[in-house]
């Protein structure tokens, strides 16, 4: 679950990390009043969406008058911002952040993620702030400096100083950076975050460090113990189908193809998408119904898949381990009857009671194609889309 920049900065302030004075506003009048609270300009106004690339898309602007602030708010509030990180429809803008402008001398990067290989929280710092860290990692990886947090001792000030020295910081900047590092690490651990970025972390012309931007991603599996973060969730920034799937504990990710995929197991789901592409098709989604593929969950999965107008056929790929394939077949038949599926449905069942399940599908009289193998299923669903 992602947070907006203004929400990230609110948390930064509570953990002792410096950020520009700013206010999130929902109306042009609020935006003008925010500028008055901040004081003399210039100011920076920013669209609040869960996507990068806002500046290049016109969603971030330096302004010198309250009239310009009002004009920016009127231009964007209630509209959608399209960036290179959004789809063609963009993300809705419901708030803009009005901040005091900062005199920037240099831009740095500071971020943290969970490194699955080392099973540690790893902090990354670089002198190449203000650009995508992925690009830096690809082109000049030697410019990214890392430290890993020991899960027993937690973050240590010496680790912050180590990164500060590698960034070329001196004097008071070392102490300031160490304070930011410790605050960010504590925030990461206490709030069950999955990712945090300050990009850029700037050095002002007065020689001070300021968190100019902030991006936080919370671990969705830990939200049950983070009530404050749950309240910060902005569902308008999420794909409606993905949000609906989450309510049923279905793992759904929308893609750009026209073959809907319903699979039990994340690995099998990825393999299913691969074999669809191998035979010339394009998956419309990733959907993992998990181990408990009940009739109710299968029905909801069909509803979610078919809510995408691009879907011309559905590929159901189920491996019956503990779950019996004949019961899965009953669920598929019931779901197709309830939802009223009007596109071809190709089903491949393998494992526990697979033959009985395939017979039930064949005897149902519905527009369900029972495949004999994974390859056969992929070929049939691609052919079905081509026939349409």
From Swiss-Prot:
Keywords: ATP-binding, Ligase, Magnesium, Metal-binding, Nucleotide-binding, Tricarboxylic acid cycle. GO terms for biological process: succinyl-CoA metabolic process; tricarboxylic acid cycle. InterPro entries: ATP-grasp, ATP-grasp_succ-CoA_synth-type, ATP_grasp_subdomain_1, Succ-CoA_synthase_bsu_CS, SUCC_ACL_C, Succ_CoA_ligase-like_bsu, Succinyl-CoA_synth-like. GO terms for molecular function: ATP binding; magnesium ion binding; succinate-CoA ligase (ADP-forming) activity; succinate-CoA ligase (GDP-forming) activity. The keyword Cell membrane does not apply. The keyword Nucleotide-binding applies. Substrate binds at residues 264, 321-323. It catalyses: succinate + ATP + CoA = succinyl-CoA + ADP + phosphate; GTP + succinate + CoA = succinyl-CoA + GDP + phosphate. Mg(2+) binds at residues 199, 213. Residues 9-244 form the ATP-grasp domain. One of its GO terms (cellular component) is succinate-CoA ligase complex. Binds 1 Mg(2+) ion per subunit. Its EC number is 6.2.1.5. Pfam families: ATP-grasp_2, Ligase_CoA. Its cofactor is Mg(2+). ATP binds at residues 46, 53-55, 99, 102, 107. Pathway: Carbohydrate metabolism; tricarboxylic acid cycle; succinate from succinyl-CoA (ligase route): step 1/1. Heterotetramer of two alpha and two beta subunits. Succinyl-CoA synthetase functions in the citric acid cycle (TCA), coupling the hydrolysis of succinyl-CoA to the synthesis of either ATP or GTP and thus represents the only step of substrate-level phosphorylation in the TCA. The beta subunit provides nucleotide specificity of the enzyme and binds the substrate succinate, while the binding sites for coenzyme A and phosphate are found in the alpha subunit. Belongs to the succinate/malate CoA ligase beta subunit family. This is Succinate--CoA ligase [ADP-forming] subunit beta. The gene is sucC.
